[in-house]
């Protein structure tokens, strides 16, 4: 009996050991096979950075700080040229923004060992992120990354870091219960506006500290493909949180209640960048959103001068809907309104436990 017990323990221990070894091998394969699809470009001497007072110029592009304190960026060319110009013009701002972001993470995770584990987890989680970001935007991010510091290479290469940072808004969803994300927006048109024109308003509440919000950037893009557009963000951010293109199409995003994502997909700001650059109508915006899988839930308020109205694209990792208004106004906070999502358990929980319905009611009063 004693011998049988010893054999049982021995074989069980061997089995557990082999299972652990197989798991370690599997995780190692995932980790070392992670591919962010780093572009292969050789920088060219396209020009010289010229700086006078508050104006910086490089290869026909410029960055200046206006009297309001906002930074204004104008870039043109192909994707890599745009990214390279952004990097050359704003290298100090890129460093400041990244330092503030990493310092904020260090406050939350002060242990270097935990930070190393966090990096390991992010590599595993976002191992296929490159596949979910269109090549044009990867090229632009790569151009920017050439001017980024190597001080934080323990997190990843400059390109890998900049690509991952574009998930910052999405990662905020995981902290939504802590009120890092809570936006409000509205649109009104027809008899509800003084001159019958389409009016869009929004409040962007994504808080990562006062230092993170110190350098606000208004970017004016003249891409070789698609429409010219303007967007508001921060240095290094090529995704769109709020913006308008030359056809009069506007985009604003509002977080919705999400389950914790289990795998990487397209960051929501990259999806809305694609919409802003390539859509002129609500239907075109919807078609672009339909072809991309996102890993968080979001409401995207689309205003269209050509359509003369606005609508909300409600999107989750599993499904999508277009919510329209029967009247001349539409309101968007942080819960879904369409028949597709209205009765979902997560949406009902969000309505019951967040301030989203109260902000919605306040916008109705205004």
Model-derived regions, located:
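N-terminal type II signal-anchor transmembrane helix
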Residues: 5-38
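C-terminal, well-structured catalytic/ligand-binding subdomain of enzymes
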Residues: 26-153, 190-199, 203-232, 237-366
